[in-house]
Amino acid sequence: MSFVERFCNSKDALKNKKFIVVGDFCLDRYMYLDSRLDQRFDYCDLDTYFMYDEKLYPGGAVNVAKNILSMGATVICIGLIGNDGNGYDLKRVLKNYGADVDCLYKYDNRITNTYYRPIRRSDKKDKYMNELLFINPKLTGVDQEKDIIDALEKNINVVDGIVIVEQFDKDSCSSITPKVKKYVNSMANKFSDKFFLVDSRSNINKYTNMYVKCNQYEFMKAM
């Protein structure tokens, strides 16, 4: 019976297994506002909204790692984050879930991918406001690609499978650059005994020798 068949037929299929999750690690920051606290100050003609709470949730590859961990597996996280407060919080969230974050590499010239989601309470109702997306705008450097590839090569022999998570359209700024794609495709061909799965919003047609996860819109976009 193949790994996929075991996974579909047993809730314990991932128990005691070890996986790499590589790709775009993101942090979701939910900011809770209360209209009763609104104020206007003399230095600005706009109302000032006050936050009364903030909660952090996993996004992108962080959420994938969390779900795999919840099924009893071990997860090694491989990716790029910024040397910033959001990167610190993202690693803290992953550590709390029990993930190995030694291969999440911090760079001063990168921004940690973060979704800001403000929710404003007014008249006893919560209104979801425009989402603010803070993503890395700079091209991924050769040294950063090398970090990803070296970490994959170092850990491939100790895991049962690899899950690739590509969250954004512009792969040249992502952890999964065209060069990294080429490398994971070669790995999937070489290590055919291991489980490979890719979750990509825009580039599923660029992967070979692995299982693909996409919704109907992503599928049609790739056709």
Located regions from the model:
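Ribokinase/PfkB-type carbohydrate-kinase core domain
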Residues: 1-39, 50-223
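Active-site gating loops and adjacent loop-to-helix segments of metal-dependent hydrolytic enzymes
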Residues: 43-47
